[in-house]
A protein has these predicted regions:
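Sec-dependent N-terminal signal peptides of Gram-positive bacterial secreted proteins and lipoproteins
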Residues: 4-25
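Contiguous, well-ordered beta-strand patches that form the walls/edges
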Residues: 38-45, 52, 56-214
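Short beta-strand edge/turn micro-motifs at domain boundaries
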Residues: 33-35, 195, 217-219
Length: 221
């Protein structure tokens, strides 16, 4: 299985967006907020076999829905921490992995049928040859990568140390260690909905346009 490196790239930016209002005395985000990040494209691209030179003809384009809810907790000074809803995400992630196994197995069945073997014949042949069922063998072979991907995602999303950054007007500025501005994000705030509308460099050129808008919704007390 291809390692899903692209997933963490999508999730990295959400650990910063919640800090937009820190240091702004006119606005308080105290409480809990949630943002749902869609990982479908990244997860599916990582496991897609349709472009494989040898086996691609036996696979359709992969599309497995997957998302993660990220919960931000703001203090009265707008410093924040963020964590994924790990119980929900673990269940959703495990379900997505099972669907990916189904996808991989179905392609192998198509290959076997092209070679003149039925599914049952291929299952029996595979188990006799490898000492395990096709599904169990694939799960065993991919377990280390899958566990690593899951841990990487959780680590990228989690910010356990309180974070605090600043704001100017409707812009959140990224800075280096010396306080030099590197780029900024724009936002709107309407009631309990915070929308990050875009990200730009200091020449006002859009960055990662496909990742926006990102929406945070305030959770009930």
């Amino acid at each position: 299985m291809k390692k899903l490196k692209a997933i963490s790239a999508v999730v990295v930016c959400i650990c910063l967006i919640a800090s937009i209002f820190a240091g702004c005395s006119k606005i308080s985000l105290e409480g809990k907020w949630v943002s749902t990040i869609d990982l479908t494209e990244e997860f599916s691209e990582g496991g897609d076999m349709s472009g494989d030179a040898e086996m691609g003809q036996y696979y359709d384009k992969l599309n497995i829905p997957l998302s993660v809810d990220v919960i931000y907790t703001f203090d009265s000074d707008n410093s924040y921490t963020c964590v994924p809803d790990e119980e929900k995400f673990k269940a959703d992630f495990d379900e997505a992995v099972e669907k990916m196994l189904d996808y991989m197995i179905e392609g192998m069945y198509k290959y076997a049928e092209a070679e003149g073997m039925s599914k049952n014949e291929f299952d029996a042949f595979y188990k006799e040859t490898n000492g395990a069922s096709l599904r169990d063998d694939i799960r065993s072979e991919t377990k280390a990568d899958i566990d690593s991907i899951y841990k990487e995602l959780i680590d990228e999303i989690t910010e356990s140390e309180p974070q605090k950054l600043g704001i100017e007007d409707d812009r959140f500025y990224h800075t280096d260690d010396n306080g030099n501005k590197l780029g900024y994000q724009t936002f709107t705030l309407e009631g309990d909905t915070l929308t990050i509308t875009g990200e730009y460099d200091m020449q006002d050129k859009p960055v990662d346009e496909d990742e926006y808008p990102i929406v945070l919704t305030k959770m009930a007390e």
